């Protein structure tokens, strides 16, 4: 059983129902809707196809709505793409209605002329083109081309080292967020997060819509790296978005940031996703490079909850095979991890709350007793996430009465979910475990399972119960 989860970005290469179903069969745990592209109508069609494929295959598949964020972009070029060569001069203006040409182009960012200073760099299209600011004349930013290349309509701009004065949510993001909440998305990702406070506007809109969902902070700005501890505390999960991060800060720092962020998220029982260019060569090729295979494996060994595919599945020529390949790499990496048994407690990973201590006790009891499964009864998902944090080699099953919680746990390492009725007592939990695990052939009579839950149910952080049970036997206290 593969433990780390796979997130797949949907797009033109995976738009049909059959293609989406094939992704689920290949190992997709979460479908990502990149709201930087496509209309609400297009994404809504994908939404229904994902739900249908999940129902027909019996797999739990979460839906992640990824907000574009306040992405800074160039404007429109009247005559198409423009080639800039080293030493050329080029002007970017914040004036409205400017059509781009060989010498000048507009931008979506009204604050550009006030935020940059001479000597700073502006990177275009993920760093493919580099411009150095030479002068600022009112709304016009004059630059010299340091590294040339082709630029075209709406290419992204990065301003490394510049604290840009943009809001956490753009008007488009707010519209997209309301659409995602009303449509039924399971998780929201917020782009270009800088501080823990950036979640506040998202929560305000969620409260207005009457639906609170987990929010993922995308770590892709140097400010986010500086504030990583408060971001992990404030948000429900993090995504290490290595594309923009590798443009905004020196490339050699990105692997260190990735490892640090994974450790911090695990310590706080928050899911973490590693994203961008994981199997990038498979957009065109049927096999990944050895370096890409090592990249995926090392993210798994570091302890990531999930690995993400972007262009590989949205526009790639080998989308389905890419997911199969990623699943095989993950499973191979996990063989060595799981063979080492339950990781020992250290000062870094020891529990710091009652719920964490109870979850650790359940994991250790399962290890000592040779349990067939660890079982978490959960309404909010918190109990399952706390158990997952300890990376026990014993398979972890989460029983929940809430479909949304089931879908949200699709991001959490090692969790396999069952949807069942609300259990209002430990005896009801035991009965449900017996019924479902025997029904699906997952256990034999007499197998040991360790059950943990929270009381009162549905309250995050209330995990306080552990019970050892032998399947099909009456071992309740007399």
Residue ranges of each PLM-predicted region?
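Non-catalytic helical/linker scaffolds that mediate oligomerization, partner binding
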Residues: 1-478
């Amino acid at each position: 059983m593969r433990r780390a989860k796979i997130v797949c970005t949907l797009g033109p290469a995976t738009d049909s129902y059959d293609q989406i179903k094939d992704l689920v069969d290949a190992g997709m745990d979460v479908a990502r809707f990149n709201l930087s592209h496509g209309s609400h109508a297009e994404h809504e069609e994908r939404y229904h196809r994902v739900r249908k494929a999940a129902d027909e295959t019996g797999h739990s598949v979460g839906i992640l709505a990824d907000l574009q964020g306040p992405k800074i972009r160039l404007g429109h070029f009247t005559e198409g793409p423009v080639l800039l060569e080293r030493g050329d001069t080029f002007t970017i203006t914040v004036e409205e209605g400017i059509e781009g040409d060989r010498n000048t182009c507009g931008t979506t960012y009204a604050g550009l002329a006030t935020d940059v200073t001479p000597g700073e760099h502006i990177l275009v299209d993920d760093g493919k083109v580099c411009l150095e600011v030479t002068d600022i004349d009112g709304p016009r930013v004059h630059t010299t081309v340091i590294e040339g290349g082709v630029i075209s309509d709406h290419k992204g701009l990065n301003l490394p080292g510049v604290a840009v004065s943009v809001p956490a949510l753009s008007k488009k993001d707010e519209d997209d967020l309301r659409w995602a909440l009303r449509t039924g998305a399971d998780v929201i990702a917020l782009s270009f997060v800088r501080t823990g406070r950036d979640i506040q506007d998202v929560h305000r809109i969620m409260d207005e819509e009457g639906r609170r969902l987990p929010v993922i902070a995308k770590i892709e700005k140097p400010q986010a790296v500086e504030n990583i501890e408060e971001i992990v505390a404030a948000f429900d999960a993090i995504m290490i978005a290595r594309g923009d991060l590798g443009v905004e800060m020196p490339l050699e720092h990105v692997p260190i940031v990735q490892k640090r962020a994974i450790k911090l998220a695990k310590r706080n029982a928050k899911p973490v996703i590693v994203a961008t260019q994981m199997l990038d060569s498979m957009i065109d090729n049927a096999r990944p490079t050895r370096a890409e295979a090592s990249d995926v494996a090392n993210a798994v060994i570091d302890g990531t909850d999930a690995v993400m595919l972007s262009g590989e599945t949205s526009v790639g020529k080998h989308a389905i095979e890419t997911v199969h390949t990623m699943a095989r790499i993950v499973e191979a990496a996990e063989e060595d991890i799981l063979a080492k048994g339950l990781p020992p407690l250290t000062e870094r990973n020891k529990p710091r709350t009652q719920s964490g201590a109870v979850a650790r006790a359940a994991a250790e009891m399962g290890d000592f007793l040779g349990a067939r499964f660890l079982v978490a009864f959960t309404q909010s998902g918190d109990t399952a996430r706390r158990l997952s944090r300890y990376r026990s080699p014993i398979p972890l099953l989460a029983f929940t009465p809430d479909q949304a919680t089931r879908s949200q746990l699709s991001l959490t390492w090692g969790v396999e979910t069952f949807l069942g009725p609300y259990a209002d007592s430990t005896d009801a939990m035991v009965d449900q475990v017996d019924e479902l695990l025997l029904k699906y052939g997952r256990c034999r009579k007499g197998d040991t399972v360790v059950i943990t839950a929270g009381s009162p149910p549905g309250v995050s952080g209330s995990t306080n119960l552990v019970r050892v049970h032998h399947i099909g036997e009456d071992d309740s206290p007399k």
